[in-house]
């Protein structure tokens, strides 16, 4: 009964409780994405304690990212069929439990299961539903709202990176993981903020969502009709998968996800390998995080301006391409003074395109499909996130340096940008001939009928 009395908004309110949703999503990104990034600070500790090579140790970070993205559709399902609050609170419990259990690890395989799978599953239940909720509350200021919400990743990295390093020094890596587990339990509080909202667009797309369930005593014919309606609703929920624009976007995410992960995993180990101290290496992650915030908010604000709103797609692909270009230069930066500009540039463009991912996705599929679409988008990140750090680690073990690993990441992101650019150009070329036909059809044509001349104007 409570759900039936929920107020129906014609359009997103663009404010009000929406700002509390932004704050909640902000802290969700702190507890999920920032904590995931800071796992790379444990890399050297795990490698030293368990006496393993780069590739095997890198699987920990890969499994966390992969589980988060692979299970994203589960988060979308729970959000769509129960509520966003239920999904985030449940995810907070699982993620916190995974980190606490990881503090008792006796092998890398144990960490694969607890820190990788269990924590990653918890993050998945929180991440995509929280991001989708922001899109339901904002339309005119959507990019700015997402910029603020997604900046939690950068702010969290800036604060947590040195704190985690300090916790490791004071309490060992076991104590640091235990404290992180308590910190991540705050996701349950974030979930309580996610007040549901019903939009007119939702009721138009999914009118059958709240139909009462048929009793088992109903006739087989009625049950068959109900089953067909349920299948129809499910099909409508994912009809965007057949859109050519979404297919191109989905393919580009595969290359983007492969390229963006290794720099975060190997920035600290690479810095240590060229003589940078542990504190300075952690500070590089902090710089990257704080500039990431600037990229989130400024790019979100700028692309909300009227003159750039229609060009968000181009802004997104430019940011991705420049981020890849930064990776190509990383192998020649061999001191702290040169690595600082890298952290600034890479962090800014990373924040820029990350803030636009849900915006671009929403522009393609619509607000009513955003939660399901984000589940698919993050699902596509799973395999690249799983494979890219171990592949990069294998390249480091094989070649003896980080050059090949960073070059592969850079070229992958640049290819993603080129793919999106080519799709944009092809789409524009396809539209031009149609425009030419319409213009030529406006010319008056003479038609001879019984000796009279009639002038027919083509109706466009």
From Swiss-Prot:
InterPro entries: MFS, MFS_dom, MFS_trans_sf, Proton-linked_MCT
Ranges in the topological domain labelled Cytoplasmic: 1-10, 427-460
TM region(s), chain numbering: 11-31, 58-78, 86-106, 115-135, 148-168, 177-197, 246-266, 282-302, 329-349, 354-374, 376-396, 406-426
Gene Ontology CC annotation, any one: basolateral plasma membrane
Catalytic activity reported: creatine(in) = creatine(out); guanidinoacetate(in) = guanidinoacetate(out)
Domain of life: Eukaryota
Topological relation to the membrane, as annotated: Multi-pass membrane protein
The keyword Protein biosynthesis is assigned to this record: no
Keywords: Cell membrane, Membrane, Transmembrane, Transmembrane helix
Localization terms from the record: Cell membrane; Basolateral cell membrane
Pfam families, alphabetized: MFS_1
GO BP terms in the entry: creatine transmembrane transport; creatinine metabolic process
Molecular function in Gene Ontology: creatine transmembrane transporter activity; transmembrane transporter activity; uniporter activity
Family: Belongs to the major facilitator superfamily. Monocarboxylate porter (TC 2.A.1.13) family.
Role played: Functions as a transporter for creatine and as well for its precursor guanidinoacetate. Transport of creatine and GAA is independent of resting membrane potential and extracellular Na(+), Cl(-), or pH. Contributes to the process of creatine biosynthesis and distribution.
Protein's name according to its UniProt entry: Monocarboxylate transporter 12
Biological source species: Xenopus laevis
Gene encoding the protein: slc16a12
């Amino acid at each position: 009964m409570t759900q039936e009395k929920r107020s129906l908004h014609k359009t997103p309110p663009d404010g009000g409780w929406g700002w509390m949703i932004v704050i909640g999503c902000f802290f969700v990104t702190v507890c999920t994405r920032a904590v995931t990034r800071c796992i790379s600070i444990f890399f050297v500790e795990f490698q030293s304690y368990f006496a393993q090579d780069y590739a095997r140790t890198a699987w920990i970070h890969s499994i966390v990212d992969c589980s988060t993205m692979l299970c994203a559709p589960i988060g979308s399902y729970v959000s769509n069929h129960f509520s966003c609050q239920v999904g985030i609170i449940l995810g907070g419990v699982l993620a916190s439990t995974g980190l606490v259990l990881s503090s008792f690890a006796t092998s890398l395989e144990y960490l694969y299961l607890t820190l990788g799978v269990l924590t990653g599953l918890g993050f998945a239940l929180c991440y995509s539903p929280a991001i989708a909720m922001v899109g339901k509350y904002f339309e005119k200021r959507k990019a700015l709202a997402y910029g603020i919400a997604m900046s939690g990743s950068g702010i969290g990295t800036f604060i947590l990176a040195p704190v985690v390093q300090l916790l490791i020094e004071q309490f060992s890596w076991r104590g640091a993981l235990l404290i992180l587990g308590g910190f991540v339990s705050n996701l349950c509080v974030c979930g309580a903020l996610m007040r549901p909202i019903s939009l007119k667009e939702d009721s138009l797309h999914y009118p059958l969502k709240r139909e009462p369930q048929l009793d088992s005593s109903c006739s087989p014919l009625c049950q068959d009709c109900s089953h067909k309606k349920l299948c129809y609703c499910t099909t409508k929920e994912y009809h965007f998968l057949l859109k050519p624009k979404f297919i191109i976007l989905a393919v580009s995410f595969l290359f983007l996800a492969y390229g963006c992960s290794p720099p975060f995993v190997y920035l600290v180990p690479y810095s240590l390998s060229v003589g940078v101290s542990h504190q300075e290496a952690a500070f590089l992650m902090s710089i990257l995080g704080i500039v990431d915030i600037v990229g989130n908010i400024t790019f979100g604000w700028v692309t909300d301006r009227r003159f750039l709103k229609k060009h968000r797609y181009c802004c997104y692909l430019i940011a991705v391409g420049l981020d890849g270009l930064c990776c190509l230069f990383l192998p020649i930066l061999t001191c702290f003074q040169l690595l600082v500009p890298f952290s600034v540039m890479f962090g800014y463009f990373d924040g820029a395109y990350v803030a636009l991912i849900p915006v671009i996705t929403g522009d393609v599929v619509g607000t009513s499909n955003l939660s399901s679409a984000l589940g698919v988008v993050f699902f596509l990140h799973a395999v690249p996130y799983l494979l890219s750090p171990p592949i990069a680690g294998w390249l480091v073990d094989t070649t003896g340096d980080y050059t090949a690993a960073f070059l592969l990441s850079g070229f992958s992101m640049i290819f993603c940008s080129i793919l999106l650019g080519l799709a944009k150009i092809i789409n524009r070329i396809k539209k031009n001939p149609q425009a030419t036909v319409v213009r030529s059809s406006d010319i008056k044509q003479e038609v001879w009928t019984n000796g009279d001349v009639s002038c027919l104007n083509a109706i466009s």
